[in-house]
Amino acid sequence: MGPEATTGAGDEAAAGGGRFSVTTERRADAVVLTLSGELDHDTAEPLREALERHVRQGARRILVDCGPLGFCDSTGLNILLHARLAAQEAGGRIELAGLRPPVARMFEITGAHAVFQMYAGVEEALADERPA
Protein backbone atom coordinates (compact mmCIF):
# COMPACT_ATOMS: atom_id res chain seq x y z
CA MET A 1 0.00 0.00 0.00
CA GLY A 2 1.53 3.31 -1.04
CA PRO A 3 1.36 6.56 0.87
CA GLU A 4 -1.73 8.74 0.65
CA ALA A 5 -1.23 12.47 0.94
CA THR A 6 -3.46 15.21 2.20
CA THR A 7 -2.19 18.74 1.68
CA GLY A 8 -3.10 22.09 3.18
CA ALA A 9 -6.15 23.24 5.09
CA GLY A 10 -8.71 23.98 2.44
CA ASP A 11 -8.00 25.93 -0.73
CA GLU A 12 -6.12 28.74 0.99
CA ALA A 13 -3.29 26.57 2.36
CA ALA A 14 -2.99 24.63 -0.89
CA ALA A 15 -2.97 27.88 -2.85
CA GLY A 16 -0.40 29.26 -0.42
CA GLY A 17 2.20 26.86 -1.73
CA GLY A 18 1.15 23.83 0.30
CA ARG A 19 2.75 25.01 3.55
CA PHE A 20 1.80 21.76 5.33
CA SER A 21 1.11 18.19 4.33
CA VAL A 22 0.31 14.87 5.98
CA THR A 23 1.34 11.66 4.24
CA THR A 24 -0.06 8.36 5.54
CA GLU A 25 1.65 5.01 5.13
CA ARG A 26 1.22 1.59 6.77
CA ARG A 27 4.54 0.18 7.99
CA ALA A 28 4.93 -2.94 10.11
CA ASP A 29 2.35 -2.68 12.91
CA ALA A 30 1.97 1.09 12.62
CA VAL A 31 0.20 3.78 10.69
CA VAL A 32 2.93 6.34 9.96
CA LEU A 33 1.82 9.94 9.47
CA THR A 34 4.63 12.07 8.05
CA LEU A 35 4.19 15.79 8.72
CA SER A 36 5.91 18.25 6.39
CA GLY A 37 6.12 22.02 6.50
CA GLU A 38 4.49 24.37 8.99
CA LEU A 39 1.78 23.10 11.34
CA ASP A 40 -0.30 25.97 12.69
CA HIS A 41 -3.88 27.17 13.13
CA ASP A 42 -4.33 27.72 9.39
CA THR A 43 -2.92 24.36 8.25
CA ALA A 44 -3.84 21.91 11.03
CA GLU A 45 -7.11 20.42 9.79
CA PRO A 46 -5.56 17.64 7.64
CA LEU A 47 -3.67 16.38 10.70
CA ARG A 48 -6.78 16.43 12.88
CA GLU A 49 -8.74 14.55 10.20
CA ALA A 50 -6.01 11.93 9.67
CA LEU A 51 -5.58 11.25 13.38
CA GLU A 52 -9.33 11.05 14.02
CA ARG A 53 -9.81 8.72 11.04
CA HIS A 54 -7.08 6.29 12.08
CA VAL A 55 -8.16 6.23 15.73
CA ARG A 56 -11.78 5.65 14.63
CA GLN A 57 -10.64 2.83 12.31
CA GLY A 58 -8.95 1.12 15.25
CA ALA A 59 -5.26 1.76 14.57
CA ARG A 60 -3.39 0.45 17.61
CA ARG A 61 -0.19 2.34 16.86
CA ILE A 62 0.05 5.70 15.12
CA LEU A 63 3.58 6.95 14.62
CA VAL A 64 3.85 10.65 13.79
CA ASP A 65 7.05 11.35 11.84
CA CYS A 66 7.95 14.96 12.60
CA GLY A 67 11.29 14.87 10.75
CA PRO A 68 10.18 17.10 7.86
CA LEU A 69 8.14 19.35 10.18
CA GLY A 70 9.78 22.76 10.46
CA PHE A 71 7.27 24.48 12.75
CA CYS A 72 4.48 23.51 15.14
CA ASP A 73 2.39 25.92 17.20
CA SER A 74 0.00 25.28 20.09
CA THR A 75 -2.75 24.23 17.67
CA GLY A 76 -0.67 21.32 16.42
CA LEU A 77 0.34 20.40 19.95
CA ASN A 78 -3.29 20.39 21.11
CA ILE A 79 -4.36 18.21 18.18
CA LEU A 80 -1.67 15.68 19.07
CA LEU A 81 -2.58 15.73 22.76
CA HIS A 82 -6.30 15.24 22.09
CA ALA A 83 -5.58 12.45 19.62
CA ARG A 84 -3.30 10.77 22.16
CA LEU A 85 -6.14 10.65 24.67
CA ALA A 86 -8.60 9.35 22.07
CA ALA A 87 -6.15 6.65 20.97
CA GLN A 88 -5.48 5.66 24.56
CA GLU A 89 -9.22 5.36 25.28
CA ALA A 90 -9.53 3.14 22.19
CA GLY A 91 -6.65 0.89 23.30
CA GLY A 92 -4.03 2.40 21.01
CA ARG A 93 -1.18 4.84 21.21
CA ILE A 94 0.35 7.78 19.39
CA GLU A 95 4.12 8.11 19.28
CA LEU A 96 6.39 10.80 17.85
CA ALA A 97 9.61 10.46 15.88
CA GLY A 98 12.27 12.73 14.44
CA LEU A 99 11.45 15.99 16.21
CA ARG A 100 13.78 18.75 15.07
CA PRO A 101 15.13 21.12 17.75
CA PRO A 102 12.55 23.94 17.37
CA VAL A 103 9.62 21.51 17.54
CA ALA A 104 11.22 19.41 20.29
CA ARG A 105 11.80 22.57 22.33
CA MET A 106 8.08 23.40 22.29
CA PHE A 107 7.28 19.90 23.59
CA GLU A 108 9.85 20.34 26.36
CA ILE A 109 8.70 23.83 27.39
CA THR A 110 5.06 22.73 27.62
CA GLY A 111 5.81 19.42 29.32
CA ALA A 112 4.15 17.50 26.49
CA HIS A 113 7.34 15.47 25.97
CA ALA A 114 6.47 13.60 29.17
CA VAL A 115 3.24 12.11 27.79
CA PHE A 116 4.47 10.89 24.40
CA GLN A 117 6.84 8.05 23.61
CA MET A 118 9.47 9.76 21.45
CA TYR A 119 12.04 8.30 19.10
CA ALA A 120 15.00 9.75 17.23
CA GLY A 121 13.57 8.49 13.94
CA VAL A 122 10.96 6.29 12.29
CA GLU A 123 13.22 3.24 11.93
CA GLU A 124 14.09 3.30 15.65
CA ALA A 125 10.39 3.56 16.49
CA LEU A 126 9.40 0.70 14.20
CA ALA A 127 12.11 -1.49 15.73
CA ASP A 128 10.55 -0.98 19.19
CA GLU A 129 7.86 -3.63 19.43
CA ARG A 130 6.22 -2.73 22.74
CA PRO A 131 2.58 -3.77 22.90
CA ALA A 132 -0.16 -1.15 22.49
Named regions from a protein language model:
Residues 1-9:
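N-terminal acidic, proline/glycine-rich, low-complexity intrinsically disordered segments
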Residues 4, 14-49:
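STAS-typified acidic loop motif
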Residues 99, 122-123:
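Short, ordered loop/turn segments at secondary-structure junctions
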Residues 117-121:
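Short acidic-hydrophobic, aromatic-tinged amphipathic segments that line or gate anion-handling sites
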Residues 129-132:
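A short, charged, amphipathic alpha-helix used as a generic interaction element across diverse proteins
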